[in-house]
Design a protein with these regions (language model features):
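Conserved SAM-binding loop of SAM-dependent methyltransferases across substrates and taxa
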Residues: 1-14
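Class I S-adenosylmethionine-dependent transferase superfamily signal
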Residues: 9, 48, 85-89, 116
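Short glycine-dipeptide loop
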Residues: 14-16, 92-98
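S-adenosyl-L-methionine
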Residues: 15, 21-68
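Short strand-turn motif at the edge of the Rossmann-like AdoMet-binding core
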Residues: 23, 63-64, 102-105, 128-129
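Glycine/threonine-rich flexible loop motifs
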Residues: 67-78
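A short glycine-rich, Lys/Arg-flanked "PGG" loop and its adjoining helix->strand segment in the class I
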Residues: 77-95
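Class I S-adenosyl-L-methionine
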Residues: 105-146
Length: 146
């Protein structure tokens, strides 16, 4: 559901400054500032960077394209979103910060993992037990910028 990561992070880190961005409005979440807009718009990335006074501890990307039914095309498009979020993270995370992103298994999967390994010291791919077996959805967890 839209905002589920924000909801989770709000509950787990009560004293943190949290900002979410989505193309659509989401239900108000305690301790979360929500920005309606496209993350790929550089203006919005500047707004996000300026919202925080310092580099960040954690950046989470749950972005995905609207699915087309073509699983490989969807994986490629969502992979591009993940790479964009990873590049933003490299510029905005503290040296020991972490980046988590949704990714889909597909033709660009290895490229995304390699890209993350070039920028982070620790990289793991995680498929939640709650994810359906036939789902191509996974998460990449990256820690400590190189």
């Amino acid at each position: 559901a839209p905002g589920s990561w924000s909801q989770y992070l709000s509950e787990k880190s009560k004293n943190s400054k949290i900002l979410s961005i989505d193309l659509k409005d989401i239900e108000k979440i305690h301790n979360v500032t929500h920005l309606i807009g496209d993350f790929l718009d550089e203006k919005n990335q500047t707004i996000i960077s300026n919202f925080f006074e310092d580099k960040l501890d954690l950046i989470v990307s749950d972005m995905a394209v609207n699915t087309t039914g073509n699983k490989n095309l969807d994986a490629i498009s969502t992979g591009e979103l993940s790479i964009n979020a990873m590049e933003f993270s490299v510029r905005n995370l503290k040296k020991d910060g972490s980046f988590v992103s949704k990714i889909f298994m597909g033709s660009t999967f290895n490229e995304i993992v390699e890209n993350c390994k070039k920028n982070f010291k620790e990289v793991k791919v995680y498929k939640p037990p709650s994810s359906r077996k036939d789902s191509k959805e996974s998460f990449i967890i990256c820690k400590k910028i190189r």
